[in-house]
Regions:
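Hot-dog-fold acyl-thioester-processing enzymes
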Residues: 2-60, 107-109, 115-196
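HotDog/MaoC-like acyl-thioester-processing domains
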Residues: 3-8, 64-148, 205-207, 216-250
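Acidic/His-leaning functional-site neighborhoods
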Residues: 159-241
């Protein structure tokens, strides 16, 4: 993304963020992307005080992940992030993860919204601009469709415990991938690494509350649904394997 306005950080895959394959967990990859996105904003003066003064906040509405090779434990990776101007109430942010040698490892396509924290409503565009922060257009994108399926199998209930919640007091967006993977049969996640995920965030799950989790096979992957108070809290579509399926290439 060198031809676009972007921001790059180098990170190291921590042991505590690695799974049984000694590779970075997908949820941890989302956390790393979340961090570099926040650092990008702060580098342009958009810190907590900036948003507090403007009574606004960024929220993630949906995001998708494509993995070519998940980085391994202790591997150094580069995260390059770039965002578009707001279009139809959302801001696209692309984050490309590469190795030290330039190998493209993964891509995250995240769609952000801006919220008026006083009025409690989503805005079409923010009431402010930051010079040189955004791009007019980022042509690359990932499929954001969550392939639903029936019948659903119950996978239990998860409580929004202290360790799952972030500085906003609800389950961190990245951890819904853990919840989704935990819902599936163990042989599914053992058979092959995650190659694609798309997730939609419908309702926050505040600390102390619970979410009921369900799953179903869907085409070449799996559909996972989380419900809170009889309403969808999140929906996720997951594929496991070394290559993306034909359905995702359309």
């Amino acid at each position: 993304m060198s031809e676009y306005r972007s921001y790059t950080e180098q990170m190291t895959v921590l042991d505590g963020d690695s799974d049984f394959r000694r590779c970075l967990k997908p949820s941890a990859l989302f956390r790393y992307v979340e961090q570099v996105s926040a650092d990008h904003a702060r580098a342009y003066g958009m810190d907590h005080a900036f948003f507090r003064e403007r009574h606004s906040a960024f929220l993630v509405g949906k995001q998708a992940l494509r993995v070519w090779r998940m980085p391994g434990r202790a591997e150094k990776i580069n995260l390059t992030t770039a965002c578009e101007v707001f279009k139809k109430g959302t801001m696209k942010r692309l984050t490309t993860i590469t190795s030290e040698t330039g190998e493209k490892l993964a891509l995250v396509d995240c769609r952000w919204m801006i919220v008026d924290t006083e009025a409690g409503r989503i805005l079409r565009t923010p009431g402010w601009t930051m010079p040189d922060f955004q791009n007019d257009d980022l042509p690359e994108e990932l499929p954001q469709i969550v392939h639903k399926s029936q019948p659903l199998t119950a996978a239990g209930e998860r409580r929004a415990s202290y360790s799952m919640c972030d500085l906003n007091g609800h389950i961190n967006n990245s951890l819904y991938l853990d919840i989704a993977c935990d819902a599936l049969l163990q042989e599914v996640v053992e058979a092959a690494p995650l190659s694609f995920a798309s997730i939609k965030y419908h309702r926050e799950v505040p600390m102390g509350q619970t979410v009921q989790v369900f799953y179903a096979p869907s085409g070449n992957g799996w559909y996972v649904l989380g419900r809170r108070e009889e309403h969808a809290a999140f929906e996720c579509y997951l594929e496991f394997g070394s290559s993306v399926t034909e359905s995702l290439q359309k």
